[in-house]
Amino acid sequence: MLGIQTGSFRGCLKTVLTVGFLFLGLGCSPRDFLTRRLAGDLISQSEAFKLPQTFWLTTGLVSNKEFNSPESMVLQRRGWIIGTLQKCPVGLEPPPCWDVELSPLGVTAIRPLIGSETQRGPFGIEVAQRTLEGITGISKAGNFADVEFMWHWAPLNQVGAALYDGGVRYRSMVALREFDDGWRVVNEETHSNQTMEDALRNAEAMAP
């Protein structure tokens, strides 16, 4: 008789525990627990992270500073743009100035990326996209967390490949905050946490 009662008790206890864990599971969503996988998903899906890098190409009359900028020098070395020395108009400095246009090679490489517009520019060209490499650390304090992650630029075309070295890795740290529906990337400034835009702007380049 005692054995039957003990078996019944164990069966009831198992049922109660099963039901309890079921209700506990229903009350928690995957976003309630900040894992590295969830942090990576939140970062890679954020609008700031997904925003492609746009390079602005200006043709026509430009200042000497703009013509000799690092990006312009890359395009010159590739033979995609050429410049003719010109006198600077009033308001455009420092001299000398340059009349910039696409070379025949540049027409082949760049023209398909900017369409058939005939104006002198500037032309916006999407050249690279961020790629998340992984989460390197999470530091939690209450309903806030600082997440450190690594990423790199993935060129979208040959202009992007010329301007961005895909082998350079960047380290950033962004704030996440826990709400009633789970964790979210912080998109507004707080007293001690970086937004996603700040995290990407302040990224630290790492040696390949």
How would you describe each model-predicted region?
Residues 24-27:
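C-terminal motif of bacterial Sec signal peptides marking the signal peptidase cleavage site
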